[in-house]
C-alpha cells in the first residue's frame, strides 16, 4: 500500500470555490478486476498458501458473513514466496483504509480486486503484528473502530465564531441524528448549501479529529475521515482532475461507498473458486 495516498486530505488541500470545475460526467478510474494468471504462473508458492485460499473459498461457499462479521484466514506466518504470491493474486481494489489504534499500532487495509476481500495488516513501527485475509462487507478492524468514538451531548458545541451562516443549525441537525440510530443514515451535503469557511471551522471543531482515513476510487476519488464523534464522517469527492464534486458529513456506522454489497461477495466467491480450480489444475503432478 502506498505510504502517501492520504496526502490530499485535510485543510487547505482541496481547491477553493473559485477554482471549482467538474467534468460533465466523471471519468472512471481503471481498477484491474482479474488477477494476472500469467503473473501468478511466475510466482513460486507452497501448498500451505493454496490451502488457505481453499479454506476461505469454502467458508464463503457455506455462508456469507452478516454486517459486522467477517470470515478470515491468517497470513502472518507465510514465507516470502507465498506472501509475494498472495500480493500478486489479490492486487489492489477500490478501497484503502488506515486506522490508528489505541495501542499506537496502525492497521493498513486494502480491498483486493475481489470485491469484499480485504488484506488486513497491523504494524507497530516496522514490526508486523497481524496479517489476515478477510471476507465481508467491511473489514473487522473497521467495524471495531467505528464503535469507539464518543456519543455527543450539547456541551460539545464549540463557542460561536465570527462569520457563521449555517454552522449552528447544521451542528444541531448533525447531533440529533448521531443520538438517534433510527435516524441514520443521514447526509448533510455542504456542497448544496450556502456555507462559509467559519461554518466549516465550527463543524470541524464540533466533530474533532478521528483515527480512521479511507480512500476510495471509481468515479473520481473519495477521501473519507472519521471524526471524533461516533458514526460521523467527513467526506470529500473529487473528479479525475482533482476538482471538487461533493463535500458532506455522513452520519452512519460506515459510509455506503466503503461497503461491499452482498452480490459483490457472491461474485467474488465464484471468482475465487475459479482461481482455486485453475491453481489446482496448474499444479505440477
Where are these regions (language model features)?
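N-terminal alpha-helical "arm" segments
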Residues: 1-36
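An N-terminal, globular interaction/scaffold subdomain
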Residues: 25-108
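Short, surface-exposed polybasic-aromatic patches that bind anionic ligands, especially phosphate groups
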Residues: 53, 169-172, 176, 185, ...
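Terminal, regulation- and interaction-focused segments at domain boundaries
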Residues: 62-74, 180-193
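Short, structured protein-protein interaction patches enriched in aromatics and acidic/basic residues
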Residues: 77-80, 96-119, 212-242
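Extracellular/lumenal glycan-associated surfaces
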Residues: 82-91, 194-210, 231
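Surface-exposed beta-loop interaction hotspot
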Residues: 123-187
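C-terminal structured domains
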Residues: 212, 218-285
Amino acid at each position: 500500500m502506498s505510504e502517501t495516498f492520504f496526502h490530499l486530505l485535510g485543510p487547505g488541500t482541496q481547491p477553493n470555490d473559485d477554482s471549482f470545475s467538474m467534468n460533465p460526467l466523471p471519468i472512471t478510474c481503471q481498477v484491474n478486476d482479474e488477477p494476472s494468471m500469467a503473473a501468478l504462473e511466475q510466482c513460486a508458492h507452497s501448498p500451505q498458501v493454496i490451502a488457505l485460499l481453499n479454506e476461505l473459498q469454502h467458508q464463503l461457499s457455506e455462508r456469507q458473513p452478516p454486517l459486522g462479521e467477517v470470515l478470515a484466514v491468517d497470513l502472518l506466518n507465510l514465507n516470502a514466496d507465498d506472501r509475494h504470491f498472495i500480493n500478486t493474486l489479490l492486487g489492489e481494489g477500490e478501497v484503502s483504509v488506515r486506522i490508528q489504534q489505541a495501542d499506537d499500532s496502525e492497521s493498513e487495509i486494502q480491498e483486493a480486486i475481489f470485491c469484499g476481500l480485504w488484506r488486513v495488516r497491523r504494524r507497530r513501527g516496522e514490526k508486523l503484528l497481524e496479517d489476515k485475509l478477510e471476507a465481508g462487507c467491511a473489514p473487522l478492524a473497521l467495524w471495531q473502530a467505528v464503535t469507539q468514538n464518543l456519543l455527543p451531548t450539547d456541551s460539545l458545541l464549540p463557542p460561536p465564531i465570527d462569520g457563521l451562516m449555517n454552522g449552528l443549525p447544521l451542528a444541531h441537525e448533525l447531533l440529533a441524528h448521531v443520538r438517534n440510530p433510527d435516524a441514520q443514515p443521514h447526509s448533510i451535503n455542504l456542497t448544496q448549501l450556502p456555507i462559509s469557511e467559519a461554518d466549516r471551522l465550527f463543524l470541524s471543531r464540533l466533530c474533532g479529529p478521528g483515527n480512521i482515513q479511507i480512500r476510495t476510487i471509481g468515479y473520481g476519488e473519495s477521501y473519507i475521515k472519521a471524526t471524533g464523534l461516533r458514526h460521523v464522517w467527513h467526506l470529500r469527492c473529487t473528479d479525475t482532475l482533482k476538482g471538487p464534486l461533493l463535500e458532506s458529513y455522513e452520519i452512519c456506522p460506515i459510509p455506503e461507498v466503503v461497503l461491499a454489497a452482498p452480490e459483490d461477495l457472491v461474485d467474488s466467491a465464484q471468482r475465487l473458486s475459479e482461481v482455486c480450480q485453475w491453481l489446482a489444475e496448474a499444479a505440477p503432478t
